Amino acid sequence: MIEKPRVEVCFTPNQYPLHIEDFQVVVAIDVLRATSAICTAFQYGVKKIIPVSTLDEAIEYKEKGYYVAAERKGKIVSGFEFGNSPLSYMNNDLKDETLVLTTTNGTKAINVAKGIEHLVIGALINLDALSKYLLRLNLSLIHI
């Protein structure tokens, strides 16, 4: 058992390339809202979430008929019915559906780490489950 994992913290998606090493786990946390919205959406039955970095990608999915949530600078982007507020997902409207999500920072943080074997979503609302999961993985290098 590894006694003390090394934990590195990266504060913005733009800094991620400067921190890249042989990390075994990346935990994507958007302290303000994105990861809380993702956790809430799953809690209320969303089947799958596709995080995209740009509005252009989000528009492409919307044109294909997907439910799409888009936020920039804390506001729902015009033309989209959902944003990054967890309250938007506290119902069964999207139960068993796929949701495409783009946010100012959160989805960018997720996408820069896509190649990592263990990419997990962290939020204050899933902190207990996240901590237990990371301990079960028993890995030595964790990047947050």
Predicted regions and their residues:
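Acidic/Gly/His-enriched mid-domain segments of enzyme catalytic cores or analogous surface patches
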Residues: 50-138
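Conserved small/polar residues in nucleotide/adenosyl-binding loops
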Residues: 142-144
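N-terminal glycine-/serine-/threonine-rich phosphate-binding loop
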Residues: 1-58
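Acidic-glycine-rich active-site phosphate/pyrophosphate-binding loop
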Residues: 2-6, 134-139
